[in-house]
């Protein structure tokens, strides 16, 4: 459903303009309603509300041994809605938790997006691509 990378800037109020190519899909499939939460790799996950509900149910069903991860995902989730110009507000708490100040990278990851501080993503990608590829790619043809 969602793919590709977009370099975006937050405005002074912490709002992000969703790229035009994604707005129509988000309006049609989620009524412009999204949920943003933390990702364990230091970015944010941005879900269309129906996809969030599926993810939330899976997380909520985890055993007590995963209680802290439930807190990370569910306790930090914030519901947002695209405004008339396609902007969403990224809360100060979520921005602070991920180091997002202004320059960001929005990555389409299939059924959701990842929102990264641009410099953080570039550093992590450079580090990952300098190392060996995971074994799961051993039989993968490029």
From Swiss-Prot:
It comes from the Bacteria. GO terms for cellular component: cytoplasm; nucleoid. Residues 5-51, 77-120 form the SpoVT-AbrB domain. Keywords: Cytoplasm, DNA-binding, Repeat, Transcription, Transcription regulation. The keyword Transcription applies. It is found in: Cytoplasm, Nucleoid. The keyword RNA-binding does not apply. GO terms for molecular function: DNA-binding transcription factor activity; transcription cis-regulatory region binding. InterPro entries: MraZ, MraZ_C, MraZ_dom, MraZ_N, MraZ_sf, SpoVT-AbrB_dom, SpoVT-AbrB_sf. Pfam families: MraZ. GO terms for biological process: negative regulation of DNA-templated transcription initiation. Forms oligomers. HAMAP family: MraZ (MF_01008). Belongs to the MraZ family. This is Transcriptional regulator MraZ. The gene is mraZ.
């Amino acid at each position: 459903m969602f793919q590709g990378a977009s370099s975006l800037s937050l405005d002074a109020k912490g709002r992000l303009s969703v790229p035009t190519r994604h707005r129509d899909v988000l309006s049609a499939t989620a009524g412009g309603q999204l949920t943003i939460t933390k990702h364990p790799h230091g970015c944010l996950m941005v879900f269309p509300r129906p996809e969030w509900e599926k993810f939330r149910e899976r997380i909520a069903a985890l055993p007590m041994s995963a209680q802290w991860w439930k807190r990370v995902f569910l306790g930090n989730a914030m519901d947002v809605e695209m405004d008339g110009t396609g902007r969403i507000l990224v809360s100060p708490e979520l921005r602070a938790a991920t180091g997002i100040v202004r320059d960001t990278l929005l990555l389409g990851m299939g059924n959701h997006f990842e929102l990264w501080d641009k410099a953080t993503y570039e550093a992590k990608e450079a580090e990952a691509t300098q190392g060996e590829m995971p074994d799961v790619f051993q039989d993968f043809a490029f």
